[in-house]
């Protein structure tokens, strides 16, 4: 963030905020070593809310999953967007 944007009070775009949240969640899971996926329903609900601002979708149109294999974690988000 630049000093100018800080002084002018520009808000971050919702995409960058969502990206930061996802990075924090994944980093937290890697450090904690807890069983995953307790946050996935909340994440799915929040993604639907954000995407619904721009495109009409329902809860059934988005699927979120987290898979772990050895040291690799994959967060998969599938979104069905209707034809325009």
Swiss-Prot record:
Pfam families: MinE. Keywords: Cell cycle, Cell division. InterPro entries: MinE, MinE_sf. SUPFAM superfamilies: Cell division protein MinE topological specificity domain. It comes from the Bacteria. Signal peptide: none annotated. One of its GO terms (biological process) is cell division. Prevents the cell division inhibition by proteins MinC and MinD at internal division sites while permitting inhibition at polar sites. This ensures cell division at the proper site by restricting the formation of a division septum at the midpoint of the long axis of the cell. Belongs to the MinE family. This is Cell division topological specificity factor. It comes from Burkholderia ambifaria (strain MC40-6). The gene is minE.
